[in-house]
UniProtKB/Swiss-Prot annotation:
PROSITE patterns: GATA_ZN_FINGER_1, GATA_ZN_FINGER_2. One of its GO terms (biological process) is positive regulation of DNA-templated transcription. InterPro entries: GATA_TF, TF_GATA_pln, Znf_GATA, Znf_NHR/GATA. GO terms for cellular component: nucleus. It comes from Arabidopsis thaliana. Transcriptional activator that specifically binds 5'-GATA-3' or 5'-GAT-3' motifs within gene promoters. May be involved in the regulation of some light-responsive genes. This is GATA transcription factor 5. Coiled coil: none annotated. The keyword Kinase does not apply. A motif (Nuclear localization signal) lies at residues 167-174.
Length: 339
């Protein structure tokens, strides 16, 4: 009804406009510019609203499309809720049984839904109750490919049930080459034999059934340690013999045989000990000087202090002067003057 009223009002207004002088001037200008007459152009044809049914059909089609889109947008949510609430989670089989024509969704949406169902199922199978207790879980057939039988998780066990015993390392140097032998040597002590017997007592273990513990064996390619000690002792004996053959050195002034350094003296290089050589170099080496370690040291005749040595020499000087004066008087008599 409203559309019919609008159509009648529009027609009346257009009829009034065609009779106005402004409209006539507009038509004259357009005909002069475009080159067609007014008779060929009619306003009624332009404003012909006889195709109202076409517009009505288009509106109904648009409404139907909107409803289809709304229904299609609601259907995936319902399907997702049903998948979450279900307990068996058979995602791939359910989507395979339904034809694609029933779902009004594109191929990309279907792929996304399948991926979501696989992800949910994988997460629930990984964190399910039986898997937490340690028992193997069965996987669905679509996860194992074309296999008909379910794949069970296999727990691997090491071939060595008991730990392999190891020999304690010693702190001595191992200079010689060592070869590992498969059999136990008979020269090992009671402690080593007891340890090997206790460690290899398990006959059921396949590792120790044919071989004992590996023990190092010293080869004879390099000389053993005692030979090295013999070499050292021979060197020391040789050096001692050389020292015996050489004349033993001693100080020419005090007779000392051991000194930290030999120094030059009146007899040549390395003829005085360290103490006597220092005093000889400074000009203070006197016969009364002797170091305390000298074998010829006498406290009455010698001293190792320079002041005491000078005092001793002063005590000896007066007697010697008096004796020399008396001798001169006796030997040279006074000449008697002649009359």
């Amino acid at each position: 009804m409203e559309q019919a009223a609008l159509k009648s009002s529009v027609r009346k207004e257009m009829a009034l406009k065609t009779t106005s002088p402004v409209y006539e001037e507009f038509l004259a200008v357009t005909t002069a510019q475009n080159g067609f007459s007014v008779d060929d152009f009619s306003v009624d044809d332009l404003l012909d609203l006889s195709n109202d049914d076409v517009f009505a059909d288009e509106e109904t089609d648009l409404k139907a499309q909107h409803e289809m889109v709304r229904v299609s947008s609601e259907e995936p949510n319902d399907d997702g809720d049903a998948l979450r609430r279900s307990s068996d989670f058979s995602g791939c089989d359910d989507f395979g049984s339904l034809p694609t024509s029933e779902l009004s969704l594109p191929a990309d949406d279907l792929a996304n839904l399948e991926w979501l169902s696989h992800f949910v199922e994988d997460s629930f199978t990984e964190y399910s109750g039986p898997n937490l207790t340690g028992t193997p879980t069965e996987k669905p057939a679509w996860l194992t490919g074309d296999r008909k039988h379910p794949v069970t998780a296999v727990t691997e066990e090491t071939c060595f049930k008991s730990p392999v015993p190891a020999k304690a390392r010693s702190k001595r140097n191992r200079n010689g080459l060592k070869v590992w032998s498969l059999g136990s040597s008979s020269s090992s002590g009671p402690s080593s034999s007891g340890s090997t017997s206790s460690s290899s007592s398990g006959p059921s273990s396949p590792w120790f059934s044919g071989a004992e513990l590996l023990e190092p064996v010293v080869t004879s390619e390099r000389p053993p340690f005692p030979k090295k000690h013999k070499k050292r002792s021979a060197e020391s004996v040789f050096s001692g013999e050389l020292q015996q053959l050489q004349p033993q050195r001693k100080c020419s002034h005090c007779g000392v045989q051991k000194t930290p350094q030999w120094r030059a003296g009146p007899m040549g290089a390395k003829t005085l000990c360290n103490a006597c050589g220092v005093r000889y170099k400074s000009g203070r080496l006197l016969p009364e000087y002797r170091p305390a370690c000298s074998p010829t040291f006498s406290s009455e005749l010698h001293s190792n202090h320079h002041r005491k040595v000078i005092e001793m020499r002063r005590k000896k000087e007066p007697t010697s002067d008096n004796e020399t004066g008396l001798n001169q008087l006796v030997q040279s008599p006074q000449a008697v003057p002649s009359f």
